[in-house]
Design a protein with these regions (language model features):
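Ordered, amphipathic secondary-structure segments that act as subunit-interaction surfaces
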Residues: 99-151
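Core RNA-modification/binding signature centered on pseudouridine synthases
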Residues: 7-8, 16-23, 35, 171-259
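A contiguous pocket-lining binding segment that forms or flanks enzyme active sites
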Residues: 150-182
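Short, charge-patterned binding micro-sites
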Residues: 50, 75-107, 137
Length: 259
């Protein structure tokens, strides 16, 4: 028996027509393009009470819902999955309260910052409070946030124990600690980021320079424990960011952002 041909010649015009239709390439669909923002606003907000346990991801969802409820005319990114133009910077860790968190939003229409503040504050959950909204220039927020001032309440320890731990920590040239990050376990120096560290009763106040990786107050507490083994907090410390802005490394003064 003769071998069957590998390719058969198709002469049926109807079959050829169907094959031609199937073979047509699918037209390429361009993603939707959105106009750039006509106005940028800087939002200063606080995390108070139980809202301090809100994760950064959960806050982002709550904030986007608040924008919709408040009727803020957001600008959107272009592409297949457009999202509102929101720029976050140096968010406080989950569990920390804050009086000075910042983000920026890009708008599709010019709005009165005070009206946006009032509408957003009314739309956000209790404990997430909008402190101030001002006009801003895009793309500079992270560069302007160079330091933070924190209060750390350490219940159950005497002022003498806190002072001894602070003195031992400050006497070191370098204090390496480890922390799990999204990129795995990282080891970094906490001492270089500490500009001031003071003790008042059962409370610490610490001024931190923002560096990479970002040193947090809980990292400083871990470093204090390494420097002073007697420093063992009985109850979980309560962290509160009091200020964030431009840091003068010589004086340790934080200048809050305005415009």
């Amino acid at each position: 028996m003769a071998p069957r041909p590998l390719v058969h010649l198709i002469t049926d015009k109807s079959v050829m027509t169907r094959l031609a239709v199937v073979a047509q390439p699918t037209p390429h669909t361009q993603p939707e393009q959105h106009a750039p923002p006509v106005q940028w606003l800087r939002v200063k907000y606080a995390k108070r009470g139980r809202a301090r346990f809100t994760s950064h991801r959960d806050f982002g969802r709550a904030f986007e819902r608040a924008l919709r409820r408040a009727g803020v005319p957001m600008a959107y990114t272009s592409g297949y999955s457009p999202h509102p133009r929101i720029s976050y910077a140096n968010a406080a860790p989950t569990g920390a309260a804050s009086e000075a968190e910042y983000l920026e939003i890009g708008l599709a229409a010019v709005c009165d910052p005070d009206k946006v503040r009032d509408a957003l504050d009314a739309a956000l959950p209790h404990g997430l409070d909008v402190v101030e909204v001002v006009a801003a220039s895009p793309g500079v927020l992270a560069n302007e946030l160079t330091g933070s001032h924190w209060r750390v309440d350490v219940p159950g320890l005497s002022a003498a124990t806190l002072q001894a731990a602070a003195d031992a920590f400050l006497a070191k040239e370098m204090v390496q600690v480890q922390r799990m990050t999204k990129n795995g376990m990282r080891e970094f120096d906490t001492r270089a980021a500490v500009i001031t560290l003071n003790v008042q009763d059962a409370r610490l106040t610490v001024t931190l320079a923002h560096q990479t990786p970002l040193v947090r107050p809980d990292d400083v507490l871990a470093g204090m424990r390494l420097a002073c083994p007697e420093f063992v907090p009985i109850d979980p410390p309560v962290l509160t960011r009091l200020a964030q802005g431009r840091l003068d490394p010589e004086s340790g003064v934080i200048t809050e952002l305005r415009h």
